[in-house]
Amino acid sequence: MIGTWLGELSREQFDSEHFQRAPLALPRVARGAIPLLTWSTVIELVPKQTDMLVVRNGALRSDPAPSSFPEALALFREGYSLVLRRCERHDAGLRQLADAVAAEIDGDVQIQAYLTPANHFSFGWHYDCEDVFIAQTGGTKEYRLRQNTVNPQPTLDAMPKDMHYERETTPMMAATLVPGDWLYIPRGWWHMAHAGEDSLSISVGVLSPAARSLST
């Protein structure tokens, strides 16, 4: 899977220049992912989801997550992003994608679907303890990224509640994705994303053995 998304870039070059080092955005080479997350997929996924976040412009909604697509769509139209987690458990195509990534990269793989309404964002500036591969399947989304010097090697068992983004001094970079584009965000890199149009994207997170805990 990784090789397919790299286009003309070799796997060796990706590993030496980008993997766990620096972001990479490539156009059009992830077009095969577009059918994996459409609104039809969402209609099927929402009633199956037991792990969903509803968030709008950095604020997490505390009420129970919607259990039907009409409920989810109503919240989406109010400006809420829907984050459907562990989608590989509920969809065969996304499970195949997760298995393909797991066969190429050592780590625990999970897939999230992000549905973000136009002119909104879900989470504010944050970083993850996973390496993240994002395929845009609908609409447009601008990602802003910064290297993390505050906590450059975060681990799952020591993720702080306050990430202290205000302490960061590194320059910002940006990439806008359209359907078929993809973006790699290394573990620990700051990022946030703003939808220009109603946006659908697949986020493949890979938790490496080293990122599980400080003791590994």
Describe the predicted segments one by one.
Residues M1-E17, R31-D181, W189-T216:
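Active-site region of the double-stranded beta-helix
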Residues Y184:
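Conserved beta-strand-loop-short alpha-helix elements that form
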